[in-house]
Amino acid sequence: KSSAASDVYKRQLEAGDYPIYAGTDVRSCEQIGVHTEPELRVTERLASRADCAPKEAFDRLVAATDEQGKTEKAYESVPLSTVSRREEIEKNLPEAPDFTGDKGIKLEDVANNRATLAGFAAQLEDIELEALCRGDYVMNSKLGTPGNAAVYGGILESLREKGVPPVTATDGPSGIRLHSYASLLPIGTLLASTWNQQLVRELYSVEGAEMARKGSDVLLAPGMNIHRDPLCGRNFEYFSEDPLLAGTMGAAVVRGIQSQGVSACPKHFACNNQETMRIYNDSRVSERALREIYLKGFEICVKTAHPFNIMTSYLSLIHI
């Protein structure tokens, strides 16, 4: 259970008994134990995100009790956001370093501790900073391995002169998509059905080695969105409707790929639960649903496997 105060979001376990079941499926499981919480226990305190609240008023369905004690449906007005997201973002923007012009600092100087990243970045023109944020516009970029899904990093000659390489990214969760033959991997839903993290890690370790041979720096995988609706066109890439299973399987994929010196890229962060017309969608989600369902798998993966890249979703999330 979770509760949100004005500025604190708490994850907590209510007092009581928690039965534990085991089995091959939900129809053939049996109780094997029980966990008892003697009193309410707060497991985590987090800063509440008031800007997750809706901007426009509407009524939501809630359970109520009539005079006879029977449950009936009722409606209540949703609490509205009182926070300016623009002000929050602007308040937390880091201070930009003063532009120095080219000082001859290469990216490898930063890697070898001969210069700081801030000093390297202070050399960059606005067009170079923009290029680093954007990447190349096209799939199958001429700057990368033929058949690539994207290239980013050193897409300008001036960046490459400073030692920033063009990074080749390829689809996807079921194998490398390039203009060459590559291994075909089982889909994410099937992998999650094994419940075998070690097997998944070993599979993607082999995949990482194949990436290195074929010139793929980043595999746009694992797909980690929640199976919210059976009609979602990307469900085959995703693991589960359960964020714990999705998070642990995603972490196994990341560890396997990155054990070979290349990068994984969990996607689509977050709430990409409809593929059709996805760039026009706006997912309206409560803070609790975000924290406990749609972000939880990503949280597990990031904290335990440390992916080098993450791909955002294509939709708007609560108006952004």
Where are the model-predicted features located?
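Short beta-strand edge segments in extracellular beta-sheet folds
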Residues: V34-T43
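Extracellular and select intracellular beta-sandwich modules with Ser/Thr-enriched
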Residues: C29-G33
